[in-house]
């Protein structure tokens, strides 16, 4: 019995038709692990940064018709919410598990906070080849950093700084069949390795 990881069939919760039925599927197949990951990595980030982190499992409370296409647990230093702060995420779409750190368009002082990515531009480029960027958290698209030109990357960061709807996340994503989801030990190791790469951007 696994505690933290997800099986390929768990991702099929996103195929369930209808809001209520899909929410039931998320509650059964995905949320228990997100809650456990929330506890584990809140302690991890608190230990790594010296700041108290809180987990925020997506509630999808505003939805009244359309079922969610993704779900997640986010980590931030505010107990009441995470969207206003730079934050870490573990989440899922139907075809991927993703891990991210960055800034949403709703963040306070977004222009100032997003400049960390400008200052750490070289560090972004030096991330391992399977690291990506996400420029819209509502979409599954996450191009590999290695496939972007310098100008592409600069433009993406500038958009997060200067455009109201702009966002910027560094990310990693794996498929539901990935071997790193086969056991809790492998999954936690993958997540810790990823967050170790993200943390210098948080503390910068």
UniProtKB/Swiss-Prot annotation:
**Would you say which domain of life the source belongs to?**
Bacteria
**SUPFAM superfamilies membership:** YktB/PF0168-like
Signal peptide (UniProt feature, chain positions): none
Q: Which residues cross the membrane?
A: none
One short Pfam family name for this protein?
DUF1054
Which Gene3D superfamilies does the protein's record reference? Protein of unknown function DUF1054
In the record, the note on similarity to other proteins reads: Belongs to the UPF0637 family.
Q: How is this protein named in the record?
A: UPF0637 protein SAOUHSC_01054
**Originating species:** Staphylococcus aureus (strain NCTC 8325 / PS 47)
């Amino acid at each position: 019995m696994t505690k933290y990881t997800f099986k390929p069939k768990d991702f099929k919760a996103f195929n369930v038709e209808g809001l209520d039925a899909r929410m039931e599927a998320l509650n059964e197949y995905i949320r228990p692990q997100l809650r456990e990951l929330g506890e584990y990595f809140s302690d991890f980030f608190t230990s790594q940064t010296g700041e108290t982190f809180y987990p925020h499992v997506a509630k999808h409370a505003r939805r009244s018709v359309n079922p969610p296409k993704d779900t997640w647990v986010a980590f931030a230093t505010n107990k009441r919410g995470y969207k206003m702060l730079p934050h870490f995420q573990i989440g899922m779409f139907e075809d991927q598990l993703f891990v991210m750190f960055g800034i949403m368009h709703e963040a306070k002082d977004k222009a100032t906070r997003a400049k960390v990515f400008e200052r750490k531009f070289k560090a972004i480029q030096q991330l391992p080849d399977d690291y990506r960027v996400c420029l819209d958290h509502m979409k599954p698209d996450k191009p590999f950093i290695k496939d972007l030109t310098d100008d592409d990357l600069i433009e993406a960061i500038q958009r997060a700084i200067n455009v109201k709807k702009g966002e910027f996340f560094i990310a990693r994503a794996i498929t539901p069949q990935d071997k790193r989801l086969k056991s809790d030990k492998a999954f936690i190791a993958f997540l810790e390795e990823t967050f170790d790469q993200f943390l210098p951007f948080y503390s910068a």
